[in-house]
Amino acid sequence: MINQKKIAGEKACEWIEDGMVVGLGTGSTVYYTIEKLGEMVQKGLNITGVSTSIETEQQARTLGIPLKSLNDVTKIDVTIDGADEINQAFQGIKGGGGALLREKMVAQASSKNIWVVGEEKLVTELGKFPLPLEVIPFGWKQIKRMLENDGVETTLRKQSSGEIYETNNGNYILDIINQTFTNPEAWHEKLAGIPGVLEHGLFLHYVDIIICGKASGEIEIIKK
């Protein structure tokens, strides 16, 4: 059985050149990208990574990939990340792994953004996957109540233990569920204006290249 995530994740490494500063995304597909980059570094590739999560940082360090914080670089040449959904307009939902705020900050600082996905992530309309909002713990119930009064259903993300999930930044996540985002731009405006919502998982103007692994073993490269 073809591992769509693995073939897409490894393919993205072909865009990495010696001397680059590389944004390292978070998730089960970009995991394979980082593993491959680790092999390339061991063979002499000279890159500097900027991680988007503690999980990614730990993986990269274990593999010997040199890292710097976002504060310590002036620009990022290429960022490789995964996605929960992406439509034909190159608009996507990210944040299933809880790293949306850091992922968006790293994407914003990048000259090029490459997303690696399996073919099930390509959709005609966003919304089957929950849309995460990173919110500060102070007053999160007010945000939830306000959204639900506006007809937007949300759920507070929790760990398997039942405890409230906390992001690497110490915040909570409200997931918008049972909602189709037919006008992502309007949703961006709506959500960005809510006090206490630090970031939402709509990525609308970032991705340049999609690398899609297919069950057949083919890899589709989709450029903006």
Swiss-Prot record:
InterPro entries: NagB/RpiA_transferase-like (IPR037171), Ribose-5P_isomerase (IPR050262), Ribose5P_isomerase_typA_subgr (IPR020672), Ribose5P_isomerase_type_A (IPR004788). It is an enzyme of class 5 (isomerase). Substrate binds at residues 26-29, 81-84, 94-97, 121. Homodimer. Catalyzes the reversible conversion of ribose-5-phosphate to ribulose 5-phosphate. The keyword Isomerase applies. It comes from the Bacteria. Its EC number is 5.3.1.6. Keywords: Isomerase. The gene is rpiA. It catalyses: aldehydo-D-ribose 5-phosphate = D-ribulose 5-phosphate. Pathway: Carbohydrate degradation; pentose phosphate pathway; D-ribose 5-phosphate from D-ribulose 5-phosphate (non-oxidative stage): step 1/1. The active site is at 103 (proton acceptor). This is Ribose-5-phosphate isomerase A. One of its GO terms (biological process) is pentose-phosphate shunt, non-oxidative branch. One of its GO terms (molecular function) is ribose-5-phosphate isomerase activity. Belongs to the ribose 5-phosphate isomerase family. Pfam families: Rib_5-P_isom_A.
